[in-house]
Structure formats: structure tokens, C-alpha cells
From Swiss-Prot:
Listed EC numbers: 4.2.1.10
Family matches, as NCBIfam families: aroQ (TIGR01088), PRK05395.1-2 (NF003805), PRK05395.1-3 (NF003806), PRK05395.1-4 (NF003807)
Species of origin: Nitrobacter winogradskyi (strain ATCC 25391 / DSM 10237 / CIP 104748 / NCIMB 11846 / Nb-255)
Transmembrane listed as a keyword: no
CDD domains: DHQase_II
Subunit structure as annotated in this protein's UniProt entry: Homododecamer.
Keyword presence, Lyase: yes
UniProt pathway annotation: Metabolic intermediate biosynthesis; chorismate biosynthesis; chorismate from D-erythrose 4-phosphate and phosphoenolpyruvate: step 3/7
PROSITE patterns hit by this protein: DEHYDROQUINASE_II
Stored SUPFAM superfamilies: Type II 3-dehydroquinate dehydratase
Entry protein name: 3-dehydroquinate dehydratase
Binding site for substrate: N76, H82, D89, I103, S104, R113
GO molecular function per UniProt: 3-dehydroquinate dehydratase activity
């Protein structure tokens, strides 16, 4: 059975493809989830993709990842990245290798987006690569946990 990574998307990411396409692009959440599933599969991993507009539900997903011994977490907490100490604390509590992703470059946007609580709980943070940031995050996570791409027998 494949090790599972959780891919967690926060508020408004269900609106990808229609919400501010100049900032977030034209890909929708299903495109992101497909990209994550395919990338994870390349490393013999399974991607369990979740989205919620509610902070508490995202925390429940993090706790579930811990309870199910998930190998890692990729999280785009959306606006909660900049405000949620509770998400930070949940990620720290579970001690699961985590990568933070943002589709847009949060440092080139409004000042309030420049600080991320979730980044402080992650071993890496990617920002500004569009949805390709998810692929990069999974590659980095695979390297961190020692997953190997079976197509070329090389670690990520």
C-alpha cells in the first residue's frame, strides 16, 4: 500500500479558475488535484486532496493525517496562512513533514500577505510558481521522506 500525503487547500481555493485569474491562473481545483495525484504516484505515494473554507475543518484534516500516519502534508492555507496561529499550532503538534504552497507570489502582493504562520511550521515554502508549485512541493516532500521515483530509480 502506498504511503499517503495530504494535500490541503484552504478558503476560496474551490474558486480557482474563476477567481482573479490574472493572479491565480485559469486552472481549477480539479486540475490541481489531478496534478498532485499524478506527481505523488510518480514517487509511489497517494495524494489525499482536501479543500475547506473553514479553519476548524482544516485543523481536523491535519489531525486526521496524524491519526492515519500520513507521510507528509502539502498545504495551501490561502488567507489563513497570514492569520491562523491555530493552523500553525496544529502543524507543529503533528510533526509531519510539511510544505507550504501559494499559487501567487505572496511577497509581491499586499503587505498583510507577506507574513505566513503556516510557513513557520513547514520545512519549505513555495510561492509564485502557479499550480506548478504543488508539483515542486511534492517533489521536495518526496525527497524529504525518501520516496523514490520508480520510473528512473532516482530519489527526487
Amino acid at each position: 500500500m502506498a504511503k499517503t500525503i495530504y494535500v490541503l487547500n484552504g478558503p476560496n481555493l474551490n474558486m480557482l479558475g474563476t477567481r482573479e485569474p490574472d493572479t491565480y491562473g485559469h486552472a481549477n481545483l480539479a486540475d490541481v488535484e489531478q496534478l498532485c495525484a499524478e506527481t505523488a504516484k510518480n514517487f509511489g505515494l497517494a495524494a489525499d486532496c482536501r479543500q475547506s473554507n473553514r479553519e476548524g475543518e482544516l485543523i481536523d484534516f491535519i489531525h486526521e493525517a496524524h491519526a492515519k500516519n500520513a507521510a507528509g502534508i502539502v498545504i495551501n492555507a490561502g488567507g489563513y496562512s497570514h492569520t491562523s496561529i491555530a493552523l500553525h499550532d496544529a502543524l507543529v503538534a503533528v510533526k509531519i513533514p510539511t510544505v507550504e504552497v501559494h499559487i501567487s507570489n505572496i511577497h509581491a502582493r499586499e503587505d498583510f500577505r507577506h507574513h505566513s504562520f503556516t510557513a513557520k511550521a513547514a520545512f519549505a515554502s513555495l510561492s509564485g510558481f502557479g499550480i506548478d508549485g504543488y508539483r515542486l512541493a511534492i517533489n521536495g516532500l518526496a525527497a524529504k521522506i525518501g520516496a523514490v521515483d520508480p520510473s528512473n530509480k532516482v530519489k527526487s
